[in-house]
Amino acid sequence: MLYPAEYDITILQNATWKGTFRATQNRQVVSNIDVATATFTCDCHGLTAGTKVVITGGTTIPCGLTLNQIYYVITTGLTTSAFKLSATSGGAAITLTGTATGTFYVATPLDLTGYTVDSDIKGLSDGASIGTFTPTITSATDGAFELALTPATTAAFTTGRYGYDVSLTASGGERYYWLTGVATVQKTYSRN
């Protein structure tokens, strides 16, 4: 069973809205990042050399680490509770400087090959549809996709709070609700 993540958004009337997302799986808490050695600690992580991962979360992000970017686990420093990352498959370890604070997570991207993405906006109380996002898978093997709304679509939205969700449907018909949230539509005042 997949439980959707929650992410609230704001949409401006009569404006383009775009969001870039990455579907991930097997998320685990990183208990420590040793910036000096660029070593990530995560007990019993189960990762192997060459595995694609992304790092998310954190309060203070060390220099040299980009959140939600694809990295590769490397053999150097790999144990059952620690790993190092490279920006390229089989490449050298990334270098980190500064400090790392807050809770970080490691996850593997979901391969979206053969999947379709669907996302609708509906009334929170009545469930009436007010619009549909245009989804585009930008890198299937990296789990990356975009959702977009055109100004013509958002111009028809009434200001207020709505619900939205994102579903991922596999080629075999299995459907998962990956993301849900509140979409707040705000009025704009500029001339067209």
Identify the function of each model-found stretch.
Residues 27-109:
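Small/polar beta-strand repeat architecture
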Residues 1-26, 107-192:
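Contiguous segments within soluble domain cores/interaction surfaces
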